[in-house]
């Protein structure tokens, strides 16, 4: 183990836990459900931008994405920039209207919004189960990414790193709640920005300059410097699919959408769009370019996902590597705590309180349950991540696609189409979810498109057809989402 690398990382984790303790003390000033799961809807513009960005940018962006850029070349860097409008789309399409309705319905979770809009318990149960299944896959990816970071950069065995990482994040999420999550996201977003810039400078310097790095890539494989990438992977169908999956479809991600109901005011959302888009641009471009150019520095990696932690050790002094190891670690931790919190909220608010509405005011029991459920989920994820695949980006995209196929149209059409009803939403969820699962499992790509494209198209069609057999739901006027 490398002590110079580990010490700064330990200091970073101490700061994370310190923020969680602060959030736990602050929590006593608000009602439990609103404070624990939404931070009492008090986010300003900078915090909103950072938490949305940090939640969106995960192990896939800091580990898997640069790993793919290492394998496929500069074309993948171009592909990654497709994600640039993600924050603008999320806050622009969901943002203001979502927040207004959430306050009207006193919604704490995404499923609260769906129930208030469609008045269907079956829809809420289906949405809850879909969310939990997909989040298990998505969070497993993050745990694998965190353990690989510690393994490569700090010399800690994979299993030991997995335990350190998993236990740390489960504890601070369980006891700090949403406020700890977003405050840590803000700090972690700044760490990511600084770490990305410093690492990219180090990689370019180690490669002998930008021009020399590109020439080296061309020598290794001329396709590494073409827009199509190695193996001509970046076809028009692939790029369209990728845009739908990681940009447009982000509107349907529950842990992203819930950020849109927890900000303070209109000024916060406008500032969040601008700052968030700038941060996404810097992080996406910087990390993927570092991954692509990293092949000129270390051309013989057998596991592409190890490129960023390996580069950190190679191009930075040990102590600096320890400091900036916190950057990808921050990306991973911020995504997991958002997804863990959303999973806990789903189990408690959407499932447990649905069965036991009499427990709504029992805050002592709810606090205890929230912490225990988060810790149990963390333990299950440790088991799931014990034997990792070679490249995590595909598993992450699989989980993202499943969430988008289920949630996208019920969310968007529920907000903007007054005649949308429960039968239409249920039809879209079932068709989208089942079709995506079948196509992804059997690896069927119609006309070269990723399964998310036909799944969303047929899900939309199913919504329109199913909607004809239902009746319009009057807008809820009661300020409650008790199911």
Curated annotation (Swiss-Prot):
Any single GO CC term annotated in Swiss-Prot or TrEMBL for this entry: plasma membrane
The molecular function GO annotations come to: pantothenate transmembrane transporter activity; sodium ion transmembrane transporter activity; symporter activity
What's one GO BP annotation on this UniProt entry? Answer: sodium ion export across plasma membrane
What does the record say about its membrane topology?
Multi-pass membrane protein
Summarize the activity regulation: Pantothenate uptake is not reduced in osmotically shocked cells or by ATP depletion with arsenate, but is reduced greater than 90% by the dissipation of the membrane electrochemical gradient with 2,4-dinitrophenol.
User: Which residues point to the Cytoplasmic side?
Assistant: 24-42, 95-123, 179-189, 254-272, 327-368, 413-423, 467-483
Location comes to: Cell inner membrane
Record-annotated membrane-spanning stretches: 3-23, 43-63, 74-94, 124-144, 158-178, 190-210, 233-253, 273-293, 306-326, 369-389, 392-412, 424-444, 446-466
Residue ranges, Periplasmic side: 1-2, 64-73, 145-157, 211-232, 294-305, 390-391, 445
Similarity comment: family membership: Belongs to the sodium:solute symporter (SSF) (TC 2.A.21) family.
What name appears for this protein in its UniProt entry?
Sodium/pantothenate symporter
Phylogenetic placement of the source organism: Bacteria, Pseudomonadati, Pseudomonadota, Gammaproteobacteria, Enterobacterales
The gene from which this protein is expressed is: panF
């Amino acid at each position: 183990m490398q002590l110079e690398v580990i010490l700064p990382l330990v200091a970073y984790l101490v700061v994370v836990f310190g923020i969680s303790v602060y959030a736990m003390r602050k929590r006593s000033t608000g009602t439990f459900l609103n404070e624990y799961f939404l931070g009492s809807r008090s986010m300003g513009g900078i915090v909103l931008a950072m938490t949305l960005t940090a939640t969106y940018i995960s192990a896939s962006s800091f580990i898997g994405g640069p790993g793919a850029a290492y394998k496929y070349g500069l074309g993948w860097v171009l592909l990654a920039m497709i994600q640039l409008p993600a924050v603008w789309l999320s806050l622009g399409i969901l943002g203001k209207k979502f927040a207004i309705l959430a306050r009207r319905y006193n919604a704490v979770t995404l499923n609260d919004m769906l129930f208030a809009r469609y008045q269907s318990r079956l829809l809420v149960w289906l949405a809850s189960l879909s969310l939990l299944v997909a989040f298990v896959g998505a969070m497993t990816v993050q745990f694998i990414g965190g353990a690989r970071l510690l393994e490569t950069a700090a010399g800690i065995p994979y299993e030991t790193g997995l335990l350190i990482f998993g236990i740390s994040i489960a504890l601070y999420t369980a006891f700090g709640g949403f406020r700890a999550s977003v405050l840590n996201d803000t700090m972690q977003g700044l760490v990511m920005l600084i770490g990305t810039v410093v690492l990219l400078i180090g990689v370019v310097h180690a490669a002998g300059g930008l021009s020399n790095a590109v020439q080296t890539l061309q020598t290794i494989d001329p396709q590494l410097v073409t827009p199509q990438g190695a193996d001509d992977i970046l076809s028009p169908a692939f790029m369209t699919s990728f845009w739908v999956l990681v940009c447009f479809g982000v509107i349907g991600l529950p842990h992203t959408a819930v950020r849109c109901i927890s900000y303070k005011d209109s000024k916060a959302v406008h500032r969040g769009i601008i700052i968030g888009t700038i941060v996404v641009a810097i992080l996406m471009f910087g990390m993927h370019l570092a991954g692509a150019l990293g092949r000129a520095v270390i051309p013989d990696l057998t596991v592409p996902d190890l490129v960023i932690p390996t580069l950190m050790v190679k191009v930075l002094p040990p102590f600096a590597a320890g400091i900036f190891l916190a950057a990808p670690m921050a990306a991973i931790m911020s995504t997991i705590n958002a997804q863990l919190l959303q999973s806990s909220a789903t189990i408690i608010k959407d499932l447990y309180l649905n069965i036991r509405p009499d427990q709504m005011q029992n805050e002592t029991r709810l606090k205890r349950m929230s912490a225990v459920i988060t810790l149990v989920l963390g333990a299950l994820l440790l088991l799931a991540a014990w034997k990792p695949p070679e490249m995590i980006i595909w598993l992450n995209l699989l989980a993202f696609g499943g969430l988008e196929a289920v949630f996208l149209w019920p969310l968007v059409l529920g907000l903007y189409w007054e005649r949308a009803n429960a039968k239409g939403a249920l039809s879209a969820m079932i068709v989208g979810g089942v079709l995506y699962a079948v196509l992804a499992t059997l690896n069927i790509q119609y006309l070269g498109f990723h399964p998310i494209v036909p799944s969303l198209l047929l899900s939309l069609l199913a919504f329109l057809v199913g909607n004809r057999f239902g009746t319009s739901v009057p807008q809820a006027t009661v300020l409650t989402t008790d199911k």
